[in-house]
Design a protein with these regions (language model features):
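Conserved DEDDh/DEDDy metal-dependent 3′-5′ exonuclease domain
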Residues: 1-123
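Mixed-charge, glycine-rich, non-catalytic linkers/tails in nucleic-acid processing enzymes
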Residues: 103-170
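Generic low-polarity alpha-helical segments
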Residues: 1-3, 168-171
Length: 171
């Protein structure tokens, strides 16, 4: 998490996030890059939907003509001329303790996010399209909220490979 320039690494498996979820929903704006998975997890664990105060830098990049799915790494290079390593993307994030490489990767994943967001907001405002990006981000978070209800998530677990009995067990 990047909180006003201070990077904090939190272990979701070891903490109670109840107050944290409340702060996210009360925050004037939460900044993400490619927010879908993060938003889905927030909805699942916070038990609250939808999150309205989102600015997604990937959506902003698309509005500025950089393509629909620009990676965080490429967004940083394009907008800020910053290179970051993405070599830990597929490492085992469930194993504890996390390696120093994983911790550095996690910190870099948010270290430049606010700086990137500010650069993008400036470009969007200059083009007069900032409000359209905010509307699109709000539509995206609503769409994620309308996807599979929490009590039916079991059915998303490769149900085409499971028998009715296995699906009942998952439920």
């Amino acid at each position: 998490i990047n909180l006003n320039g201070q990077v904090l690494l939190l272990d979701g498996a070891a903490l109670d996030f109840t107050q944290f979820w409340q702060k996210i929903y009360a925050s004037p704006q939460n900044i993400f890059h490619a927010c879908s998975e993060d938003i889905d997890l927030i909805y699942h664990y916070a038990q609250q939907r939808p999150l309205h105060n989102v600015f997604d830098t990937q959506v902003a990049m698309a509005f500025l003509g950089h393509g629909l799915q620009v990676s965080y790494q490429n967004a940083l290079k394009t907008c800020l001329d910053i290179d970051i390593e993405k070599d830990q993307t597929r490492s085992d994030w469930l194993a504890r303790p996390l390696s120093q490489e994983q911790l550095s990767y996690a910190a870099n994943d948010v270290l430049y996010l606010m700086q990137l967001a500010e650069a993008l907001k400036n470009q969007l405002q200059q083009k007069g399209i900032y409000d359209f990006v905010l509307q699109d981000c709000q539509s995206l978070t609503k769409e994620i909220a309308m996807q599979t209800p929490l009590d039916e998530l079991y059915s998303d677990i490769g149900n085409y490979r499971h028998s009715r009995r296995e699906l009942m067990q998952l439920q």
